[in-house]
């Protein structure tokens, strides 16, 4: 009601599916940014490759570990395809580095509602990775805080989003809370075009 165009960047592509269909039925164009939604009823999709993002993260991990070490992969919500595509890209690179081992993998969601309990469970098994890959920068900072509170050895934490805002990914790399962040293209500039 009262809009000419809807631009949406879904975190949960299944959750908003019915709303998108309803808006399209009213004749309002819908531009979807970042990942496909379950419905094919949208006007335009501006997609960015989470697969390539996963490959970039994998290349960074292999380089940082000099081809030998351990990682823990924490995945976002797998209801959409973004987390799975990132995972696939990461693993395609890791196949080329047999001495880089994934010693734990956990689905924490994009916001990590149970992150601390999940990390407690993982670390209580005695695993200690060299690198933890977080699904986003916010979760990465929480992981860093968790490891510091528990006086664990230094673990490199990699985030995704790379926002250049106060307390964003770039700031947290500068502050040492993240070892690295990878820029996730939001697509807002393309949507405006």
Model-derived regions, located:
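Hydrophobic alpha-helical
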Residues: 1-24, 90, 108-171
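Flexible loop/hinge segments that line or gate small-molecule binding clefts
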Residues: 5, 13-52, 63, 70, ...
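Structural recognition of the beta-strand scaffold that forms the well-ordered cores
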Residues: 5-9, 29-34, 47, 71-74, ...
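Secondary-structure boundary/capping motif
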Residues: 15, 81-82, 114, 190-191
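Structured loop/turn residues at beta-strand edges in well-structured enzyme cores
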Residues: 26, 40, 66, 100, ...
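Short, amphipathic alpha-helical "lid/cap" segments that border enzyme active or binding sites
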Residues: 51-58, 62, 116, 188-192
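An alpha-beta-alpha
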Residues: 55-100, 104-105
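Structured C-terminal subdomain patch of bacterial secreted/periplasmic proteins
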Residues: 168-193
């Amino acid at each position: 009601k009262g809009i000419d165009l809807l631009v949406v960047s879904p975190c949960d592509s299944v959750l908003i599916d019915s709303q998108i269909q309803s808006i399209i039925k009213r004749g309002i164009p819908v531009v979807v940014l970042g990942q496909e939604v379950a419905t094919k009823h949208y006007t335009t999709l501006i997609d960015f490759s989470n697969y390539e993002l996963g490959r970039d993260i994998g290349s960074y991990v292999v380089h940082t570990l000099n081809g030998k070490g351990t990682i823990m992969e924490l995945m976002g919500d797998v209801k959409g395809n973004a987390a799975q595509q990132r995972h696939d890209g990461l693993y395609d690179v890791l196949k080329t580095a047999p001495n880089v081992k994934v010693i734990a993998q956990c689905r924490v969601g994009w916001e990590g509602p149970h992150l601390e309990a999940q990390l407690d469970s993982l670390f209580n098994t005695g695993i200690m990775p060299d690198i933890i890959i977080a699904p986003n920068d916010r979760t990465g900072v929480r992981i860093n805080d968790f490891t510091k509170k528990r006086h664990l050895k230094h673990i490199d934490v990699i985030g995704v989003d790379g926002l250049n805002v106060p307390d964003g990914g770039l700031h947290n790399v500068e502050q040492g809370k993240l070892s690295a962040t990878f820029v996730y293209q939001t697509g807002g500039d393309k949507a405006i075009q």
